[in-house]
């Protein structure tokens, strides 16, 4: 598959998916990253958000940057999953 993954901190591919990566592996990775993102974001609002709001501005920026990067990775994994599903269905990617 060799789908390049671009992360917000780099301008070139940092990782490439293995040619043997199947739709299930992509789905599992997406699910894991979404669960992590949900947990991170749960700490930014409501009563739990008090600790977040007390963080230094630079820490809040880095925290939200991590959330942003995870969201970008999930988007890229979704794109790769679409390509993989088309490939498995015998359609042109």
Features from the language model and the residues they span:
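Sequence/structural signature of long amphipathic alpha-helices
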Residues: 1-93
């Amino acid at each position: 598959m060799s789908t390049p993954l671009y992360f917000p901190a780099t301008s070139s591919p940092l990782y490439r998916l293995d040619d043997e990566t199947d739709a299930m592996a992509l789905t599992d990775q997406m699910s894991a990253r979404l669960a992590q993102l949900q947990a991170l974001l749960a700490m930014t609002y409501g009563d739990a958000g008090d600790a977040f709001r007390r963080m230094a501005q630079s820490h809040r920026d880095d925290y939200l940057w991590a959330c942003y990067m995870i969201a970008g990775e999930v988007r890229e994994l979704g794109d790769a999953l679409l390509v993989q599903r088309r490939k498995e269905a015998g359609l042109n990617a």
